[in-house]
Structure formats: structure tokens, C-alpha cells
């Protein structure tokens, strides 16, 4: 009989030596992002990257409510205003120039969306937290001026979240899919026939094929083409003009890329992830007219700062509603 010291023994080596090992996607085309801009030496929950028609980048800090504006050429960072609503999570820009800010509220029932100028003036409630129970994390405009939004409620065994469509007059809210666990990122295909949604705490990617009315799901059109692995899960996403989908993986320090059918075709790693740094990667977004992708991440858990990183994607970014 073997003594204990002679028994086969597991050792930390190779992938098992990483704080966030990549297993199922290890054979994908993989690149590592380069640092682009430090937003703060403090760990801030950066989110909501979006460019206006002048090419200025807007983003926010979820927990403190700061709205940032970055000049990509000079790298100058301004803070035009602070959200008056708790826990803003996304910024989308209307083609009239207004910022639409999604906010999570108390993470239970007091989320909503407000619109404001780039300086935070002329605030208008689009979806009021007093009259709904949504916890709104993200949204995407269609070409008609309506938008889809994600309801961030629930958890893995209590799927309260969903996806809804708001008509261009902002008066009618129509459910698209419901009973999902923390609906998070959302993107619309270039032809507006496919809606992508990430379900964070269930680690799933939804592909929803829509009829021409934009709210009816095609027969057998709601599918789950991909199941993610690891902690915590998929976050915000965006598309390029080839209809590839870029999904930030929160808690993993990387972005996964899928083709238009939902097959993984590449990944982007944030530097330091194997050592447990900058794991809170939340949102990818393209610089308008280019294939240059910006990714935000922070190092709150390790006491580090908040950064924007950059790579080149497969194709130029899709020119969404604000540029039409």
C-alpha cells in the first residue's frame, strides 16, 4: 500500500495557475488588449461606453453616478454631471443628441430611464421608477426611435428579469422575453431582425429572431446558442458591421466574440487577469468609423484603478441609431 507522500498529487500548473482559467474557449483566436486611458486610480464600476456624433466618448461610474466625457484625440476627461438617480448602468445616445441613462435604482424595483442633454440639463423621465418595477440595466435603439431594454432583476433560481420594447412615442411597453435571470447586455443586428441578450447569473446568451413588427418572435426564433462558464458571467455587448457580437465577461477580464449565428470566433484578454487584476470587464464599444474597440474594466477587488483598453476587432463598428 502506498504511503500518502507517494500518492498521485495535483499541482497548480498551466491553466490551473490562473485566477480565471480559460478552458472551453482556449483554442479560439486570442489577443491581449493594450492600455488606452486610465479613468481613475480608484476602482470605479465603469460602464455604458457610447460615442456621440462628434466622436466624443461617454461612460459612467455605476456606484457613484459620475458621468464622464472623454475626447479620444486628446484623452481629456471631463465630468459633465452626476446622475440624480441611483446606480446608473448604461448610456445610449439619441440621434437628437440627448443622453438616455438607464439606472438600476435599488436593484429591486426602482430602476428606470431618464434623458438629458450632454451637460445633464433638461432632464426628462422616459421610464419612471415610481410607476414601474423594472430594474433597467441597458438598452438599444432601433431605427424607428423606439428601444429595447433589459430588466436586471432576479437571480439564478428566481428569474424575474426580461427584455421589453418601448415604442417611439415612449408610451407603450411590450414584453419580448420574460422569466430570465438578470438580463444584462443587449444588442440589435444590423438588419434589426436579431436581438442579442446576455443573461448574467445563468451564464447564457440569447438570440431572438424577430418578425417585421420588432416585437413578435419568429416561430422557434428564441434560442440559446451559447452557455458560458465561470464566475460571474456575460455583461454588456456590441456588434460590428459584419454582425459579430462582442460580449464583455464580468469577473473574468476578457471579451468573447461571436459570429452572427452565435458561434464563438475569438476572445480579447485584459492584461493582468491571470493574477486576478482588472477582472471587472463590463463593456466593449467601437470608435465610430473604425474597427478599434474600447473596453472598460476596473480593479476594485485588488485595490487598483479603472482603465480603458483597446484592440482592433474583426470589422468596423456598426453605425447605430445616433449616427443615422
From Swiss-Prot:
Keyword list, A-Z: Calcium, Cytoplasm, Hydrolase, Metal-binding
Note accompanying the cofactor annotation: Binds 2 Ca(2+) ions per subunit.
Pfam families, alphabetized: SGL (PF08450)
Subcellular location: Cytoplasm
EC assignment: 3.1.1.-
Binding site for Ca(2+) 1: 47, 137, 184, 235-236
Annotated Gene Ontology cellular component terms: cytoplasm
Cofactor(s) in the UniProt record: Ca(2+)
Superkingdom of source: Bacteria
Active site: 235 (proton donor)
Protein name, per record: Lactonase drp35
